[in-house]
C-alpha cells in the first residue's frame, strides 16, 4: 500500500518554494527524497496555477491529481470538466502512472453521484479516463458499476467521519463489493483523506492519502511511528496538561523522545519553535509509515462484517 502525502507543493514545501528555503539541510533532504519517490497528491483546485506546474515540472514530479472539487465547492468556486481535462492533457508529464493508469481522479459532483457519473462520461468523451470516485452514503449501484468496469477506483466523502462509523461503512463496502470470496481485492482502491492508521491497516487498500502531516504540524505536534502524535510546540495549550505534551512527560519518556529525534537528525528545540521543521519531520514519518505498511501489507480482507441498519 502506498501512503500519499497530500498538498506538499500547494503548501510550498518543495525545492524553490518559499517554505523550502526555511528548512535545514536535513529537512530539505527529506522533502527531496519525497519528490524522488513520488508519493504526493495534489488538488487541481490548488495547483492549477502555472507557478505550481512550473515548480513540479522543474523537480520532475509525478503526482496523483485530485480535482479538489470539495474545496472549490466550500469556497463557492465552480470547476469546469473541460478545463480539468485540458490541464491533465497539458501536464501529463507530471502525473503519476500506475501500470498504465494515469493517476488523476474524476471531477466530483459534490453531493450528487449522478453528476459525478456524468462528469466521468464527459471526461472520457474528451479523451481522458479518470479514476472514478464513489462517496460514502451514495447509492451502492454506482460502486457496483465502477467495480465491474474499472481497474482502479477511489473512495471519498470519508473526512470527518469517526473511525468507528467509518469502519462500519467500509466493512460493508469491502465485503459486499471490493473483495472476492477469498478476501482478495477485485480491483485497486484508493482511499481519499484516510488519517487513521487502523483504517489504513484494516483493509487491502492499494493506496491512501492524508494531509495529517501539515495539520498536525499546524497544531503544534509531530507524528511518531512509536507513540503516535505528540505535542511539542512551545505555544501549545497542552503544555499545562499533565501527560499531554512532551514537556510534561516523565523524564524517562522525555529522554526516549529526545533520543529518537536526535537519531533521525532533528532537535526538540527546533521542533518546538519552528512550524516548518515539524512539517518536515511529519513527512519523514510518512516515509517510515510507508515502509511499515509495505511490510505488513494485507492482501486479504478477513474481518467480520458489520451491517448498517
Tell what function each PLM region has.
Residues 1-35, 248-309:
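C-terminal extensions of enzymes
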Residues 1-118, 303-309:
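Non-catalytic, usually N-terminal nucleic-acid engagement modules in DNA/RNA processing proteins
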Residues 129-192, 196, 212-236:
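Glycine/Thr-rich beta-alpha phosphate-binding loop at enzyme active sites
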Residues 34, 90-103, 122-128, 176-187, ...:
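A structural motif corresponding to the C-terminal end of an alpha-helix
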Residues 52-53, 85-92, 117-121, 143, ...:
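Generic structural signal for well-ordered alpha-helices
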Residues 66, 132, 203:
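Conserved, mostly hydrophobic/aromatic
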Amino acid at each position: 500500500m502506498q501512503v500519499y502525502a497530500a498538498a506538499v507543493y500547494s503548501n510550498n514545501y518543495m525545492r524553490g518554494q518559499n517554505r523550502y528555503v526555511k528548512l535545514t539541510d536535513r529537512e530539505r533532504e527529506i522533502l527531496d527524497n519525497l519528490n524522488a519517490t513520488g508519493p504526493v497528491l495534489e488538488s487541481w483546485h490548488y495547483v492549477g496555477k502555472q507557478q505550481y506546474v512550473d515548480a513540479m515540472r522543474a523537480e520532475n514530479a509525478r503526482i496523483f491529481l485530485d480535482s479538489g472539487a470539495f474545496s472549490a465547492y466550500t469556497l463557492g468556486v465552480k470547476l469546469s470538466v473541460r478545463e480539468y481535462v485540458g490541464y491533465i492533457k497539458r501536464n501529463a508529464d507530471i502525473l503519476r502512472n500506475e501500470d498504465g493508469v494515469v493517476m488523476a481522479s474524476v471531477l466530483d459532483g459534490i453531493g450528487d453521484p449522478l453528476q459525478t457519473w456524468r462528469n466521468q462520461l464527459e471526461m472520457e468523451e474528451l479523451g481522458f479516463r479518470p479514476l472514478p470516485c464513489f462517496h460514502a452514503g451514495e447509492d451502492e449501484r454506482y460502486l457496483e458499476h465502477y467495480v465491474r468496469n474499472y481497474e482502479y477506483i477511489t473512495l471519498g466523502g470519508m473526512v470527518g467521519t469517526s473511525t468507528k462509523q467509518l469502519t462500519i461503512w467500509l466493512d460493508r463496502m469491502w465485503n459486499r463489493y471490493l473483495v472476492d470470496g477469498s478476501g482478495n481485492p477485485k480491483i485497486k482502491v484508493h482511499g481519499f483523506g484516510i488519517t487513521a492508521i487502523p483504517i489504513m491497516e484494516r483493509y487491502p487498500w492499494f493506496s491512501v492519502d492524508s494531509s495529517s502531516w501539515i495539520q498536525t504540524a499546524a497544531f503544534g505536534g509531530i507524528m511518531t511511528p512509536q507513540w503516535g502524535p505528540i505535542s511539542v510546540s512551545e505555544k501549545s495549550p497542552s503544555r499545562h496538561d499533565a501527560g499531554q505534551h512532551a514537556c510534561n512527560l516523565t523524564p524517562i519518556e522525555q529522554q526516549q523522545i529526545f533520543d529518537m529525534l536526535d537519531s533521525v537528525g532533528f532537535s526538540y528545540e527546533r521542533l518546538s519553535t519552528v512550524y516548518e521543521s515539524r512539517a518536515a519531520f511529519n513527512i519523514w514519518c510518512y516515509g517510515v509509515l510507508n515502509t511499515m505498511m509495505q511490510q505488513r501489507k494485507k492482501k486479504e480482507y478477513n474481518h467480520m462484517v458489520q451491517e448498517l441498519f
